[in-house]
Amino acid sequence: MKKIKWQKDYSFRDYPKQWTGINPLQFTRYRSYVNRIKPGICGTYVSAALVHYLLKAERDYEIDMELLLRVLKPQIEDRQVYRGTFAWDLRDGLNDLLVDDGLYQARFHLVSNPIVIRELSKESPLPVIVGTTRLFGSKYGNHWLLAYAFGYNQEGQLFYRTYDNHGRTMAVIPASQTLACVWLEKKT
């Protein structure tokens, strides 16, 4: 992807030294789930990983990721006639999948920072889907990733540690290059 003139290159030295959230080793199981479809279906991949993580963490139930991908693709990627996926597409697809469960509902917000910090600071956090945008200089362009930890570097910049559905389970992205987010919360 062509670099935008205001895009900043971050190196390992720019990253936070301490992270808050979920242990990255819990996401290595998703390394082999790489989005190779053109155009990409990154929203489906991160939604499947979020549901898979939820079921494993809270119910110790191991569901087949391939099954989740097959079920979620039409509910997320094929919902509307427009190209690409928006936060509400992920929310609605997740809610369609979880409706019979009755315990969780998907929500979305147009700004990721307050939600990621709140959700990953909980005692038993769940990962949060975050959307990067090319307009803000993301090397991923417009893309959905699954954030499971956050941290601040020495300059006070907020970063997320993510599963990027390109084969990396410890990808670090600056929060300033994200926009919307989608998360699951328990129904009250």
Region annotations inferred by a language model:
Residues 1-83, 153-155:
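Active-site-adjacent structural segments surrounding the nucleophilic cysteine of cysteine proteases
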